[in-house]
Regions:
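Short, hydrophobic beta-strand segments
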Residues: 64-73
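Structural beta-strand segments of beta-rich domains
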Residues: 18-22
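Viral virion structural and adsorption modules
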Residues: 106-119
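Enriched for extracellular/lumenal, surface-exposed ectodomains of secreted and cell-surface proteins
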Residues: 77-97
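Solvent-exposed serine/threonine-rich low-complexity stretches and specific carbohydrate-binding patches
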Residues: 46-59, 98
Length: 119
């Protein structure tokens, strides 16, 4: 194993139709420079990341930022880290994080009946 997922930083809840940002922190735990990438899904739907892959120095931690639009249900994000062995991407680590759907409460207006007067 070369690419250790340190954490998934994402909100614990989000309203439907909002963009959810997912930051996956990955550390190169090998003694050599490594090409590292991250893939992830929410439930079974994949989502994009800012970088395809990065060259990471030994001991260095990098953040891969991904995003998706929150569906109308709770989701589980699963992320995988991968390192390049010279000819193939090798899966190194996996981590999950649950994100709950938040129901937005309609805001009550400050409008008052007394604001009207008869003409």
């Amino acid at each position: 194993m070369n690419a250790d997922i340190i954490k998934i930083d994402a909100p614990s809840s989000a309203p439907a139709s909002e963009q959810v940002i997912v930051d996956v922190s990955v550390k190169n735990i090998s003694g050599d420079d490594q090409y590292i990438t991250v893939t992830a899904v929410y439930d079974s739907t994949s989502f994009p990341f800012q970088f395809d892959y990065l060259l990471v120095s030994p001991g260095q931690t990098v953040i891969f930022r991904g995003w998706f639009i929150m569906p109308s249900k709770n989701v589980r994000v699963t992320a995988w880290s991968w390192s390049w062995d010279g000819s193939n991407w090798v899966q190194d680590d996996q981590m999950t994080k649950d994100i709950a759907l938040v129901a937005l409460t309609p805001q009550v207006s400050e409008f008052k009946i007394a604001d009207f007067y008869k003409v």
